[in-house]
């Protein structure tokens, strides 16, 4: 079912780093992408860039050899989300996500929609609690538990719905591995090399801290995309992870 013209997914990427692209210009995005090696990372395309540039942009990244995490956080009725996830799979992305708060029926429908894709199906993960949210934010939504407790509730729901993993804060990673098992993938934004600006992420960790906590894939944006030498920054982060030295 997947578009036969798309470059096959890169099955040899061992890096846990996913670079978050955040550009208003496609030319600027591709200029950055052409400075890094697809063996060193995967790429995340979110709502803004997908809305601006569409599926063709994802295909362009894939043609350059990159695996793509399509970060659109689908949240709708089960049938709509199932069709959206299938469309993402047909595009050939490496990973796609939904909101766990959409419930178990929605997540199960999304998982079922990927069955026809077999081994070519993307990883299907769910968003638990956004890393920009704290207890005050949750209280405003009528949720009286801590972000960690809410993330655990939603992670268990995701696991029971048959999905591959969750997006979560690195602070919840160790506990979620205990609750959901080592095979359950944890994808974590809010990762900043030591000394980086924290931006709008409140619950952050360094790459080495995230690795030690059990994170499988760490999403890093501006510390790499705004670096004067992004390829070297990527190499430095990977070296720190391999050597167990904080970057």
From Swiss-Prot:
Domain of life: Bacteria
EC number(s) recorded for this UniProt protein: 4.1.1.23
Gene Ontology terms describing biological process: 'de novo' pyrimidine nucleobase biosynthetic process; 'de novo' UMP biosynthetic process
Active-site residue list: 73 (proton donor)
Reactions catalysed according to its record: orotidine 5'-phosphate + H(+) = UMP + CO2
Listed InterPro entries: Aldolase_TIM (IPR013785), OMPdecase (IPR014732), OMPdecase_AS (IPR018089), OMPdecase_bac (IPR047596), OMPdeCOase_dom (IPR001754), RibuloseP-bd_barrel (IPR011060)
SUPFAM superfamilies according to UniProt: Ribulose-phoshate binding barrel
A GO-annotated cellular component: cytosol
Keywords, alphabetical: Decarboxylase, Lyase, Pyrimidine biosynthesis
MF terms in GO: orotidine-5'-phosphate decarboxylase activity
Function according to Swiss-Prot or TrEMBL: Catalyzes the decarboxylation of orotidine 5'-monophosphate (OMP) to uridine 5'-monophosphate (UMP).
Subunit structure: Homodimer.
Protein's UniProt name: Orotidine 5'-phosphate decarboxylase
The species this protein was found in: Pectobacterium atrosepticum (strain SCRI 1043 / ATCC BAA-672) (Erwinia carotovora subsp. atroseptica)
């Amino acid at each position: 079912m997947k578009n036969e013209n798309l470059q096959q997914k890169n099955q040899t990427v061992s890096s846990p780093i996913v670079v978050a692209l955040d550009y208003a210009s496609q030319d600027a995005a591709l200029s950055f992408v052409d400075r890094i090696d697809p063996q060193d990372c995967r790429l995340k395309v979110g709502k803004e860039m997908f809305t601006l540039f569409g599926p063709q942009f994802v295909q362009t990244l894939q043609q350059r050899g990159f695996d793509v995490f399509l970060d659109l956080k689908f949240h709708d009725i089960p049938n709509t989300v199932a069709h959206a996830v299938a469309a993402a799979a047909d595009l050939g992305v490496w990973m796609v996500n939904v909101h766990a708060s959409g419930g178990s029926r929605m997540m199960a429908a999304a998982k079922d929609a990927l069955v026809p894709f077999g081994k070519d199906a993307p990883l299907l993960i769910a968003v638990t609690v956004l890393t920009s949210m704290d207890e005050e934010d949750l209280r405003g939504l009528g949720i009286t538990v801590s972000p960690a407790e809410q993330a655990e509730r939603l992670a268990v729901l995701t696991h029971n719905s048959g999905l591959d993993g969750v997006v979560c804060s690195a602070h919840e990673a160790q506990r979620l591995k205990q609750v959901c098992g080592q095979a359950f993938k944890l994808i974590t934004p809010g990762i900043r090399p030591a000394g980086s600006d924290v931006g709008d992420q409140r619950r952050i960790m360094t790459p080495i801290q995230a690795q030690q906590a059990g994170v499988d894939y760490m999403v890093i944006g501006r510390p790499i995309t705004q670096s004067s030498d992004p390829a070297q920054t990527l190499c430095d982060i990977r070296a720190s992870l391999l050597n167990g030295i904080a970057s």
